[in-house]
Amino acid sequence: MQPPRERLVVTGRAGWMGMGRGAGRSALGFWPTLAFLLCSFPAATSPCKILKCNSEFWSATSGSHAPASDDTPEFCAALRSYALCTRRTARTCRGDLAYHSAVHGIEDLMSQHNCSKDGPTSQPRLRTLPPAGDSQERSDSPEICHYEKSFHKHSATPNYTHCGLFGDPHLRTFTDRFQTCKVQGAWPLIDNNYLNVQVTNTPVLPGSAATATSKLTIIFKNFQECVDQKVYQAEMDELPAAFVDGSKNGGDKHGANSLKITEKVSGQHVEIQAKYIGTTIVVRQVGRYLTFAVRMPEEVVNAVEDWDSQGLYLCLRGCPLNQQIDFQAFHTNAEGTGARRLAAASPAPTAPETFPYETAVAKCKEKLPVEDLYYQACVFDLLTTGDVNFTLAAYYALEDVKMLHSNKDKLHLYERTRDLPGRAAAGLPLAPRPLLGALVPLLALLPVFC
């Protein structure tokens, strides 16, 4: 009997070739092939995301989501989405057998179904209109405008991630890397197929390298029948509770209420719910400066057309190495030598002489009793800015993590991320979980095929 990998090579293309309409029993060859792809190449051991692509295509074309015999356009859309997914992960899949088998299979299926390479793609998991009375939005709002509803017929739930920016500024990425950055000027926090977030950081003190966020721009892109393009902009001393056009929702489309702005505290705290992409954004003004926090599904985080062009997507890849500050070393040296002696030799921003280290520690302990990275960031900010409002910035950043982070075991971080130059440049992408709902039907098949 052939080993599983050799059998996969033999059956890979043959299985795909049998998927044409009216292919009869030979069409069944596709499903064992896909089963092999899912069971033979564990996602956790490779940066290649082909299993995610396979699972999404399985989910879109099997069970209650399977296109009917006359739904060739829908099937072609699913294939184009599959092809797009493989292109996004191509850089990390060179030499991966499952990846190359999938690429060849997509070409075969598109040829058999006369699918054009150009055309619409299906959104993640083909969705249907919700039952009457089941929508939390307007009664005529389509289900595609409520991200979590698309999981009702699957056993899996979305895997959410968090990114936050606060203080001087400190960045917590979608992969829980924690960095302190200079990043003066305008920088992109998020740049994917659904929205863009850009921050502008300005010096806190004249001539100092210490910066903080003074402006934030969020662009929600036009999305099907859900929302029109909307722009939100906040600046120092101006935290509006509406988009720049004065509206508070997604416009005039059926699913407009799937995008909403809510003012929690006037001039201090705004929350934006984008239910059509399962995303929650929190913007605060603390003192003169802004903080940002977001909760977003991995699927949306990774919806990027060209990975190679995303080198400055800070929430995903972190700050460039030459923009990072080792604030833990600053904190350790300050504790041992005193902030005044450190100021002359430290590459970090100059510390105001009027703010003693002991006072910074005492003020941060009042709000942040756990000596984690948020506490250390607080001490760093007080030493480098002399502004006590940065204590609240760190406190609220941690409160936002508690509300938005899906893993309650990762609320507190204790070790700063020290990127190697190669890793910082490459910016390893987030590794999404396989779609469990698509894998469940395969569990019974694995003893047969693996």
Swiss-Prot record:
Cleavage (site feature) positions: 168-169
Protein's cellular compartments: Cell membrane
Lipidation residue positions, type GPI-anchor amidated alanine: 424
A GO molecular-function descriptor: coreceptor activity
PTM info: Autocatalytically cleaved at low pH; the two chains remain linked via two disulfide bonds.
Positions with biased composition (Polar residues): 113-125
Location of the region described as Disordered in the Swiss-Prot/TrEMBL record: 113-140
Superkingdom to which the source organism belongs: Eukaryota
Protein family membership: Belongs to the repulsive guidance molecule (RGM) family.
Keywords: Autocatalytic cleavage, Cell membrane, Disulfide bond, Glycoprotein, GPI-anchor, Lipoprotein, Membrane, Signal
One Gene Ontology cellular component: side of membrane
Protein name: Repulsive guidance molecule A
Membrane topology, record value: Lipid-anchor; GPI-anchor
PANTHER family with a match to the protein in the record: REPULSIVE GUIDANCE MOLECULE A (PTHR31428:SF4), RGM DOMAIN FAMILY MEMBER DRAG-1 (PTHR31428)
Disulfide bonding pattern of the chain: 145-226, 163-315
